[in-house]
C-alpha cells in the first residue's frame, strides 16, 4: 500500500514538472512576442513528451577521462533527493507525517549540493568544475537565510511539523505579519534553485553551460527533472509556510485545489522573473546575501524570539 501511495505522489509531481517546462517556454515566448512551442500536438501540449522521448533515446555519451561511477550517480542522486523532499508535504495529509518535517526538507536540500559537486568533479572538465563550485557556494550561502527564516516561522508556529502550519493559518496567513520574511524567503528560493536572476551556474558566456556541460541524453534529463521538481517543491513550501490554505475535514479536496493553485501562481512568478530580469554579477549575489539578508533575518529572528517572552506568552502548542 505504501508503494502505491508513493507512486501516486511521485507520478503527479513528475507530470507537473514535465508540463512546467512547456508553461515556461510558452510564458517566455509570449513575453518575447512569439508563440512558443505550437507544432507538437494541439497548442504544443505534447512537446514535453516529445522532449522526454528524444532525451531518453539518445546515446548516453561520457567523456573518456571522467569518473564513470560518480558521473552516473550524481544525476540519479539529484532526482532521488528532489522527489524524497515531497514526502512530508501536507496536501492536506502528508505521505510520511514526520515530527521534524521542515528539518527533513532543509537537510535533504543541503544534500543536493553533493550531486552538483560530484557531477562537476566527475566530468573532469574545468568549466563543469567551476560551475559546480559556483553552484555549491551559492546554495550553501542562501541556505543560511532559508534556515533562519524557517526558524522565525517555527517560533510563530510552535511546532516543527508542516501539518501544524495549516492549523496556525486558519484565520490569518503568516504572510501578513511576516511579509519581510516572505520577500526574503522568495528571493532566497530563487537563488537556492539556481533560477534567474541567480542562474550564475549556467553562465553561458563564461562557463558554456555550467556543471552539466558534459552530460547528454538521459543523465542530462535527470538533472533537468531534478531542477524543475525543486522549483515546484520550493513554491509548494512557500504556499504552506506563508499562504496556508483553509482545511475542512469534511471536504479535504478543496485544500488540495487551493494549495495547487497557489503553488502554480508562485511558480509562474518564478518564470515571469526569469523573463524580466538580467543575471546578477557574482559579487552582487554574495553581497545581497551576506550584507543584506543575513543581518535582516538575524534581527527578525531575535524579534520573534523576544516578542513571546516580552508578552509573557508562548507560541501555540500542538
From Swiss-Prot:
<keyword id="KW-0812">Transmembrane</keyword>
<feature type="transmembrane region" description="Helical">
    <location>
        <begin position="222"/>
        <end position="242"/>
    </location>
</feature>
<keyword id="KW-1133">Transmembrane helix</keyword>
<keyword id="KW-0472">Membrane</keyword>
<dbReference type="InterPro" id="IPR018086">
    <property type="entry name" value="NADH_UbQ_OxRdtase_su1_CS"/>
</dbReference>
<keyword id="KW-0830">Ubiquinone</keyword>
<dbReference type="InterPro" id="IPR001694">
    <property type="entry name" value="NADH_UbQ_OxRdtase_su1/FPO"/>
</dbReference>
<comment type="function">
    <text>Core subunit of the mitochondrial membrane respiratory chain NADH dehydrogenase (Complex I) which catalyzes electron transfer from NADH through the respiratory chain, using ubiquinone as an electron acceptor. Essential for the catalytic activity and assembly of complex I.</text>
</comment>
<feature type="transmembrane region" description="Helical">
    <location>
        <begin position="69"/>
        <end position="89"/>
    </location>
</feature>
<keyword id="KW-0520">NAD</keyword>
<keyword id="KW-1278">Translocase</keyword>
<feature type="transmembrane region" description="Helical">
    <location>
        <begin position="294"/>
        <end position="314"/>
    </location>
</feature>
<dbReference type="GO" id="GO:0006120">
    <property type="term" value="P:mitochondrial electron transport, NADH to ubiquinone"/>
</dbReference>
<feature type="transmembrane region" description="Helical">
    <location>
        <begin position="146"/>
        <end position="166"/>
    </location>
</feature>
<feature type="transmembrane region" description="Helical">
    <location>
        <begin position="102"/>
        <end position="122"/>
    </location>
</feature>
<feature type="transmembrane region" description="Helical">
    <location>
        <begin position="2"/>
        <end position="22"/>
    </location>
</feature>
<protein>
    <recommendedName>
        <fullName>NADH-ubiquinone oxidoreductase chain 1</fullName>
        <ecNumber>7.1.1.2</ecNumber>
    </recommendedName>
</protein>
<dbReference type="GO" id="GO:0008137">
    <property type="term" value="F:NADH dehydrogenase (ubiquinone) activity"/>
</dbReference>
<comment type="subunit">
    <text>Core subunit of respiratory chain NADH dehydrogenase (Complex I) which is composed of 45 different subunits.</text>
</comment>
<dbReference type="GO" id="GO:0032981">
    <property type="term" value="P:mitochondrial respiratory chain complex I assembly"/>
</dbReference>
<feature type="transmembrane region" description="Helical">
    <location>
        <begin position="171"/>
        <end position="191"/>
    </location>
</feature>
<keyword id="KW-0679">Respiratory chain</keyword>
<dbReference type="GO" id="GO:0005743">
    <property type="term" value="C:mitochondrial inner membrane"/>
</dbReference>
<comment type="similarity">
    <text>Belongs to the complex I subunit 1 family.</text>
</comment>
<feature type="transmembrane region" description="Helical">
    <location>
        <begin position="253"/>
        <end position="273"/>
    </location>
</feature>
<keyword id="KW-0249">Electron transport</keyword>
<keyword id="KW-0813">Transport</keyword>
<keyword id="KW-0999">Mitochondrion inner membrane</keyword>
<dbReference type="GO" id="GO:0045271">
    <property type="term" value="C:respiratory chain complex I"/>
</dbReference>
<keyword id="KW-0496">Mitochondrion</keyword>
<dbReference type="Pfam" id="PF00146">
    <property type="entry name" value="NADHdh"/>
</dbReference>
